[in-house]
């Protein structure tokens, strides 16, 4: 079987289109090409004999990708004429899970980032791809796996459980929904311990990901839980939208307050996290306009004080509302009567409560501890400078960070 260069352009290019574009057996520089996939193609070309692939050759290429590509990645690549290869970074930051389906003709396999994709197709979860592991499913349906990293450890990104993942998914053996319920329990404990003077009449979630935490928080406080905002399904995630004015306008278009749930009440709004603060500030104002007497705000996550460089398009530190402010100052910026953040250790405990086997997490956006050990202040400054330049020129700032996040080392 002859090796072909792997191509990735945030979509799929088949062999016919690749031939038409003159892309076969060479790497074509393109914006936002995934460095890890390009390195994989390059390494397979180097290790193959006369451009012919076999299972050992493919597995032999992965350790060099792990060595040369720093950071977080979970890759699923289709190798034309051979099969599907999946591998995960040695730190296990980004998730990858294997599913299977038993049929009359044999066992079928699939790999996805979340178990919900496996469930929705009628497959069953087999297991997670281990950090540093590669999994290969050939065209005949044979399943192979190999640990390709000499050193590996599981450090799942805790922001997956806070916000990114769907609540009906399992990530590294932990139910996202149960983890968010536990986050609400921890928040309730903190409020009863440190904010017992707050006279909360009702708990209202900011749709959608904060609902489980808000529900459990209300139960823990013994106050009613109400849906106070109706969400439009046509507006995307506001914290990754470019431009402050666009984000502010999008919040109003995305959410509409139900006045009867706010009028004359002391409301406790609950969100999964506070990033820039644009959404939270607008929502606090909307609650007041709907008639709330007092507006308290609770975050199921700790203050986001540092940028994420492991695959989340998070703002630079200068754009993070909590980066250089105390919690009291953030509350003032939001216009809230009180602000309650989750403690980082409580957040970790909430996820461990669901799966005690998870002992370490990637938490850099909260504590500035970048577990790969190679993220320097100069690197963070380079990201910020490039994003600022992209924003000033009107280019896509998201791409500016993506190019820098996927760093290849010689």
Model-predicted segments: where are they?
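Phosphate/diphosphate-binding loops
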Residues: 60-64, 116-117, 121-125, 129-133, ...
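CoA-thioester-processing core
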Residues: 1-7, 20-21, 36-41
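Extended, hydrophobic alpha-helical segments in both membrane/secreted and soluble proteins
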Residues: 203-206, 210-217, 221, 225, ...
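PRPP-dependent phosphoribosyltransferase catalytic core
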Residues: 64-66, 81-83, 88, 100, ...
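Acidic, divalent-metal-coordinating active-site segment for phosphoryl/phosphodiester hydrolysis
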Residues: 10-17, 275-276, 280
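Conserved short alpha-helical segments that host acidic/polar catalytic motifs at enzyme active sites
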Residues: 39, 46, 50-131, 136-201, ...
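Short, glycine/charge-rich flexible loops or terminal/linker lids adjacent to PRPP-binding catalytic cores
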Residues: 219-267, 278, 305-315
